[in-house]
Amino acid sequence: MAVAMDNAILENILRQVRPLIGQGKVADYIPALATVDGSRLGIAICTVDGQLFQAGDAQERFSIQSISKVLSLVVAMRHYSEEEIWQRVGKDPSGSPFNSLVQLEMEQGIPRNPFINAGALVVCDMLQGRLSAPRQRMLEVVRGLSGVSDISYDTVVARSEFEHSARNAAIAWLMKSFGNFHHDVTTVLQNYFHYCALKMSCVELARTFVFLANQGKAIHIDEPVVTPMQARQINALMATSGIYQNAGEFAWRVGLPAKSGVGGGIVAIVPHEMAIAVWSPELDDAGNSLAGIAVLEQLTKQLGRSVY
């Protein structure tokens, strides 16, 4: 039986999960992320009627990393037709690491989905073609959805990622060789790394993503962010591809559409009810927040929520 939400439930879940801290590893392949305090743990929930619940380090900002891939897809959906987007990127889970080159080579430069690095780079390449200032536009979108006007990029993280971008550059050039990348590689990479370097808190992420629980409508903006069908499609992609190669395990344990980032954040959606954001910087072997997944697992068990 489903139970009512309150902050005490969230605080109790964090207490249960905190012993897991120390078992994962903070992302160290991006030097600017390697210095993050691995003991941080937070959760925030925003409901479709605007209620906010939080516990732990829910108001501390962190690098959202690949969570931004959902936002770049949303922006692309507002500027490109369905046919234009999906002829350049697929909708299937990859089953491979998020920065794999092998699968991309075998599949003629068409990424499996927009939530692996190759797919997100294609989406950023598309945005470069239709937006005069892609980085500024993303800030406008995030600030509008969250209702917070000072959200910004962590330029130190963006620079650190660009200085260690050989693999992502290789992905972009490989797609360019197949004709699926149209703009200057360096320019698009810079935009991509800035998107990943957005600094947001769990509270801000939950408010930003509640439109996916609310049929495409943000709770404080009159104009829909996406159509109800697009919201459903994005949730479906998150369910199949948002946790990289661990999507099946996550579906088994948590049962919600979600998107993770190597900054330790995860955003999960309960359709028609709420958006959930968790943060714990220590990652498992697949690059997902180890304690964050455990928090979501306990939450869905206690609340009786699942899309399955």
UniProtKB/Swiss-Prot annotation:
Q: Does the keyword Hydrolase apply?
A: yes
The answer to whether UniProt assigns keyword Hydrolase to this entry is yes
What GO MF terms are annotated? glutaminase activity
Q: Which Pfam families match?
A: Glutaminase
For substrate, which residues are the binding ones? 66, 117, 161, 168, 192, 244, 262
EC assignment: the record states 3.5.1.2
Q: Which GO terms describe its biological process?
A: glutamate biosynthetic process; glutamine catabolic process
Catalysed reactions, semicolon-separated: L-glutamine + H2O = L-glutamate + NH4(+)
Class of the enzyme per the UniProt entry, highest EC level: hydrolase
Subunit note: Homotetramer.
Q: Please state which protein family the record places this protein in.
A: Belongs to the glutaminase family.
UniProt protein name? Glutaminase
Tell me what organism the protein belongs to. Answer: Shigella dysenteriae serotype 1 (strain Sd197)
What does the organism's lineage look like at the top? Bacteria, Pseudomonadati, Pseudomonadota, Gammaproteobacteria, Enterobacterales
Gene that specifies this protein: glsA
